[in-house]
Amino acid sequence: MLNSAEGILLCVVTSEAVLGVLGDTYIALFNCMDYAKNKKLSKIGFILIGLAISRIGVVWIIILQGYIQVFFPHMLTSGNITEYITYIWVFLNHLSVWFVTNLNILYFLKIANFSNSVFLWLKRRVNAVFIFLSGCLLTSWLLCFPQMTKILQNSKMHQRNTSWVHQRKNYFLINQSVTNLGIFFFIIVSLITCFLLIVFLWRHVRQMHSDVSGFRDHSTKVHVKAMKFLISFMVFFILHFVGLSIEVLCFILPQNKLLFITGLTATCLYPCGHSIIVILGNKQLKQASLKALQQLKCCETKGNFRVK
């Protein structure tokens, strides 16, 4: 049974997951409908569709594993459920982080303007950057899956051994380290590009700060808003992996459901928060969402009149 604090946090986690799935579903559907209408898909549209779909899968895996750990922990130590969850998690989590890294790089190369020769070279070769990152993703999968299979097979072989109970936690840590090794590169690249874009926008805002004309004042507000979105993304992104680390530690520490659910809460903030950031930061997505909300409000008003 859960105490009141654990129950409240679990409700928060579930709400975050539902909002994240709804937000990503909306992003994916909007871009798919835009592609069906215009018969053309931009790089950003492709990345947003891939990011939304992969992140929906990641959220479901996080919630599934979280609920199993809270209510049915014995299921993770018996049968093949751990193996299935691990394989799906590695595939979807790597893919999700890869898509968000591509999105950050694309915005960075599109918006920022540095005189650095490396930056200028990258800006002229955006497609080459995507190909390189695709190669990194495939390499990450090729390195992770064989090693992960070996670890899981060793775990199965020793599971009936009584001494294995004490070693299982060490194997679990090794397993988690190996399966997440491939995404460290993408995480670092994503955070660096966000930080550099924030630096560029901050310098640009500071340069325009002395000019208070209408256009420049509006441009400054847009830049400040973009900086807030980027900082929010970085906070959510870091909290996501901090939460995952807490969840991993809870498998080797004495059982502490409150700490584990706290980790889940931090983990689910990113998919929920970033989907909202993407919707608010994209003009077309924002306008379409506002129209949808207005239509829902009108339908609700008409329904109230009919009841009366």
UniProtKB/Swiss-Prot annotation:
This is Taste receptor type 2 member 107. It is found in: Membrane. It is a multi-pass membrane protein. It comes from the Eukaryota. Several bitter taste receptors with distinct ligand specificities are expressed in a single taste receptor cell. Residues 1-7, 65-87, 147-180, 254-258 are extracellular. InterPro entries: TAS2R (IPR007960). It comes from Mus musculus (Mouse). The keyword Nucleotidyltransferase does not apply. Keywords: G-protein coupled receptor, Glycoprotein, Membrane, Receptor, Sensory transduction, Taste, Transducer, Transmembrane, Transmembrane helix. One of its GO terms (cellular component) is membrane. The chain crosses the membrane at residues 8-28, 44-64, 88-108, 126-146, 181-201, 233-253, 259-279. Glycans are attached at N80, N161, N175. Residues 29-43, 109-125, 202-232, 280-308 are cytoplasmic.
